[in-house]
Each structure stands twice: as structure tokens, then as C-alpha cells.
Amino acid sequence: MLIPEAKNYLGKDCSVTFSDRHGSLHTHNVHIYDVTFTPMYGACLVADIDDIWLERVTSISAL
């Protein structure tokens, strides 16, 4: 997922499926506050549970 795609979900409650560092998939319902870019790490979603790296997001849908 790219930053412009992720910005469509700002301020919304979403269901986000992402992989962890071990490759396991997790699905969480989150509220997305911001999309940021961190040098050397890449883009991430700032959500109410934690930051989620965009390169690990496999699917996202608004609730």
C-alpha cells in the first residue's frame, strides 16, 4: 500500500490485516489518526492500537 492510498482512510474506523515480523497475519479494527513516513523505516499508519508499517498491510477496509 502506498501513502496516497492510505490517506483515504484518515479519521476512519477500519479493519486492517497485516503481517507481523514472523509472517503471521493479524486483523484488527482500528481508528486511523495519521499516515507518516519515518526515514530508514518507511511509511506507517498511526492507529489507536499501535503503528502499522504500510509494507506489511495486506488489506484494509473502512467499517
What are these regions (language model features)?
Residues 3-63:
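Conserved RNA-binding domains used in RNP assembly and mRNA/RNA metabolism
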